[in-house]
């Protein structure tokens, strides 16, 4: 069901802040373990002022932090779960027993993602492909909706939405936890 002004409105929301504390430096094995633990961690119960959003369809990823955030915003409703809006997975850039800083592991892993390194579980091409697939689905369904997704993935999703003709309320280099971006077509 579309809103009253006949424009398709999609609210892209970054999940709430995760209740997890990363080590400042770690070995490759420790980093990989922390990435797994982060993906299983709940969101913090903070007083985040989420925007008031009314829509029929709410998409969440398969990661619990997405669903928990959706419950905080929309209450107990039926959510449409999709792997297409899952965060871009991350792992260590190489194996080492030497402890390296967290910023190094994050940067090196995302650089490998960018060049489609087989070391990373998913490369940039794969991420763009699933974002494009999800945007195509949104355009076919043509219903106002909310998407509770993840920070790194949001950049790719919003880029694909622009390519599909959506107008983006505001772009950012970094999307804050709980931030909603309004996309309309």
Positions of predicted regions on the chain:
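Residues in and immediately flanking transmembrane alpha helices
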Residues: 28, 96-100, 163
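A generic "cationic amphipathic patch" detector
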Residues: 26-29, 71, 83, 92, ...
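Proteins with a high burden of low-complexity, intrinsically disordered sequence enriched in S/T/G/P/A and R
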Residues: 63, 85-87, 161-166
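Signature for phosphate-centric chemistry
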Residues: 84-99
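Active-site-proximal alpha-helix that buttresses catalytic centers in soluble enzyme cores
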Residues: 2-84, 101-132, 176-179, 184
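Active-site-adjacent alpha-helix immediately C-terminal to a catalytic or transition-state-stabilizing loop
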Residues: 2-8, 20, 24, 132-185
